[in-house]
Every structure is written in structure tokens, then in C-alpha cells.
Amino acid sequence: MSSKWTLEACFSYVFAVLMFIGMHYFQHNQGGSGLELPFNLVVWCFTSLLIGLGLLKVSHSQRLRYNRSLLVMLFSTILLWLPLLYPNAEFGEFAIDRLLGLSAGILIIFSIMQLELSRQHWHHILYFILAGVLIESIYALVQLYLLTQGNWVGFNVNATRAAGIFQQPNVLGTFVLFGLLASAWLISEKAVRSKLQQIIVFGCCFFAAWAAIVSGSRTVLIALFALLPLLFPYLKNSAEPHLLRGWLICIALGCLAPALPELLNDGVARDAIGGETTAYRVTMLKVSWELFKQQPFMGWGYGAYDGIYHNAQAAFNAQGLIKGYHFNVAHPHNEIAYWAVEGGLLPLLTLLFLAGYFIYSIFKQTWTKACFHLGLLFPCLLHTMTELPFYHSAIVWLLFCFFVSKIATEAEGLCTKPFPAKFAPKVFAGLIPLFTILFMLTGLQTIHHISTFERTGSSDVSLLEGIINPLPMLSRYEFDAMTFRLNAASKLHLSDELKNYLSWSDSLMRRKTRTENYYNRIQAFKALGLTKQAEQTYQQALFIYPDTERVSFRYIFAMRTGEKALQAYLIWNKQQLKDKPDAALYIHQINGLVLLGRIDEALRVQQQASQRLPNELKLRNIPSLKPYTEPMGSS
């Protein structure tokens, strides 16, 4: 085979196309995580090709390359699948996607180890990572500073934080840190020689640091300033001094760069590090800890976190035991807590064992090299303790697996064993990319149809009927289809169909507690004339989504029911505020007034709220009022 078309070279080419083009794919969507986000589906298409090349290498060489770290990861992955067999895994099917993603990560690590990637191949891969980071960093800055209202990508120009393609600013921040990590790895291996390479490395460091700051993520800021002391001791000994100085200077300039647009913007600062997320995270961890204590051995069952969390949180809130009420929680923003609550002790001990072994393996090297390797993984590891980056972004998971594979290889080396089976790896090398690409491309069609359906009034059912593969968005597809049938049954007074909806939603409510699910059940009960059950469901929804929190079911129900209901809600809201001022109630009132077109009144309420609650900064920055309070010509 020509040296230009070896499997290792093809691996580099596929990865290059992914970083230059594939990962930046844009398609309108309704948000979410995992396969609900179009760019993730495209990343998995390329990932399947990379896995296929690794399996093809096994077939050609008839050898297996592995080390103890790979075996530990494989064993741990098998253990993490076992809770699916627990008797409480009623909703286990909804955990299969994350287990498949985990298994695919182990498979990509295995595939990388099979390929005989030279130092030059690895350096090319690192430069391709820099290219991807540079593209996303510049795109994020364009979003924040240059896009105007009504832009074709749908970016909210009133947002104070950039998100890049990821639709989630914190994920952007973690991704761009890979640019700093890859550049550090390159200068540590003296792989930055030409002027062009220096421009790429230093330019990426500057723009990546800038994008990291404007992502507004506290987690990213902590990771940024923690990774520098972890990387520096090894870089001091291995990197050329002038490159190390340039690397540090460009990072520092990138961190300072966000201040310049503010100075040129008449002192109007963007509140990038705003929000009250700390209290919410503390609440999620506290509730998760209590849930774990109640079911420590077998957990509550894979796929059950969403439903059990909201009921437990509401109970603690009623007792005044928590501060920082959260909503729509499908994940506790801490990976260890997530697996522990759903699966109990086995996943918890497995993850701790896996982390402990990997740290032990890398610290068998010199302490400077070990700290360097730990620093390369630290941003992602930290982010998994505060959010769910691997669910939001497949490319972050893929790059993390790349780094794990390379670090494990450097720390332990590789063993080689004969593997005479030639046909099976070759078959899987073809089947995995084939089925993955077909699945993901039909998934993109699903996202397009569901997004169009929901954005055009949820009335054209032919869009749902035209979906080829609903699996990437199965929950949303089923909800949209059943809601359409509910609305039709309500209009046509089809009692059997209404009862079918209630029967279907019984299971849904145990698994996924959402305001729209409560709303639909209330409508079904009312259509059947079951007013008592409708009222009970309404009261239960108020318990889960109280009036004085960011998401109030009373407000949402009034907003969806119609103008008269919303006006009645505003009267009730004002009466409550006379007795006791509350920021959330003020915000709901202002949003309701904006929906009714009473803008002047909404502005007066905002002014009154700011006077009564001067310490509530969120009252000064209400998104629904921004179009009416922004200075003319501001972006």
C-alpha cells in the first residue's frame, strides 16, 4: 500500500475532515443533548470510520495491541452494563444510548492502539485539533460581536455568552481548552518548527483563551487556571524557552482580550460570568445524595433519575431543606452522582476504581510527566463533575478518548498478541461504519422533520409520518405524536383515544416529569369530564413546579390556556406580590405582560421590582424585555 494511503494515513485524513468540516455542521434543531443535536450525529459518522480503520488494521496485521489500562477500561465498561439486569431497571432502555456511547469510546481507544501511529501522525492529529478549535473560537467570537438580529443560524444576539456550534457555552469552553492542551503537547515534543506552525499554535492559544473567557463558564475558568501549573513543570524541562514564553503570553493576551470590546462599547459590559448556577448544583447534589442513601445497593434503576429527582426535590423544598430549586433535571450535573443514584454501588465503585487505576498508572512516570498527563485530562474530568459535556458534545468525548489512548500508551506501552481471525474484524470494520452512517443520516432527517413540525404549530402530522428512523429522538417523537392524537381526540370527543393517552402517559410521568406532560394530562381529564382528576393533577404539578421558582406551572398553564387565563394569572400574581415581594413572581408577571403586548406596564413593573428587591440582579436583565431596553444600534 502506498505510504500516502496506509491505514494510519487514512485515519489522519478522516480525522482532518472531521476537525475542519464535519464537527462544525449546522442544522436547525430544538435543542437537547446527545443525538438530538445534529452536529453530534455527524461526529459519530466520522467516529465510526475511525473505528473501522482500527478494526481493519487488526485484520491486516492479525495482531492485537493492548495494555493493562485498556483491559481495565473494558472490564469496567462491562460492569457498568450489568445494572440493566437489575429488577428495578424498568426504564433501562433509556440508558442504552449512554452505555453505547461509553462502549464506542472504549472501541475508539482500542482502534487507536491498533494503529501504528508515528510521532508525525500524532503531531498531525494535534494540529488538526488546533484547526478545529481555531474555527470554533472564531465562530464563537463572531456570534458574540458581529451577528445581527435575525441571523440565519438563529443565534440570540442578546445573549451574553458565546456557544459556538455546541449551543451550550460551557461545552464550548471545554472544547476550546483542547487547543491549549494540544499546543502544549506539540511544544513539549518540539513539533513547532516553522513560522507557519508557530502562527497556528500561538493564534489558536490566543483565540481559544478569548473564547474560553467569553463562554462565561466558571468550570472552564477553574480548569484554565488549574491546568497551567499542572502542565508547566514538564513544559519547562521539555519545551524550547521562546516557545513556552510565547505560549504563555498568547494565553494571557487571550484572557485579557474580552475587555477590549467592552472599553470600545461605551462601558456597556457583557455579564458573561452571571447566573445563579452554584445553588442549583448544590441542590442537585444534595437531592442526589439523599436518593443514593435511600437505595445505595441497587440504585433506583437505570433511566429513572428524571422522575425520582423532581418528586424528591419538591418534597425537600416543601420542608425548606434546599435552596436553589431546579427544573427539567435529567442529570445531576455530576457524572459519579448520576451513575450512583441510578445504579447504586456497582457503578460507583467501578468508576472510582477506573479513575484510581488510571491515576496510579500515569504516576508510575516521573512526577512532571504525570502532572502533565493529568493536566491534559483535567478540564474534561472537572467538567463531568459540574455538568454533562460528553452528552452535549460527541467531539469532546472523542478527543478525550484520543488523549486517554495516547496517555495510556505512553504510560504503559503496548503488548502484542497474535490474532489469527482475519475475516471477522474486516466484516465489522465495514458493518460498523455502514450501519452507523445510515442511522445518523436518517437521524438528521428526523431532527429536521420534528423541528419543522414543532416550529409550524405542531399541526402537519405528515412530517411525523415521513420520519424514517425515530430512534435518535424517540421520546420527543412519541410525545409529539401522542400530543397530536390527544388534541384531535379532544376536538372529536373520542373517549377511547383520550383514555389511551392517559394510559400511555402514566409510564411517561414516572420517568419524565415535565410541565408539558402535566398540561396534557389535565387537558385529557377535562375532555373526559374528570374534573376531580384534572384538579389533582394540577395540584401535583404546582407541588413539583412551585409559583416562586424559575419555572412555575401556574404561569405556564395560564400562558398555554389563553389570554383570559393569563390575565387572571396576572391578577393573582399581583395580589401575591402585595403580601411579599418575590423575584420569580415579578419575572413571571413581566413575561406575561410582554406576551400580552403591555410593554410599558412591564417596564414599570421591572422598575418597581428593582426598587423593592435591589439585590436581585436578575431583575435588571430579563430576556423578554431586552428588545425594549437595549439602546438603539447596540448589538
Model segments located where?
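Membrane-interface catalytic loops of GT-C/OST-like multi-pass glycosylation enzymes that act
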Residues: 32-36, 92-97, 166-169, 215-219, ...
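Flexible juxtamembrane loops connecting transmembrane helices in multi-pass membrane enzymes
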Residues: 227-228, 250-293, 327, 447-460
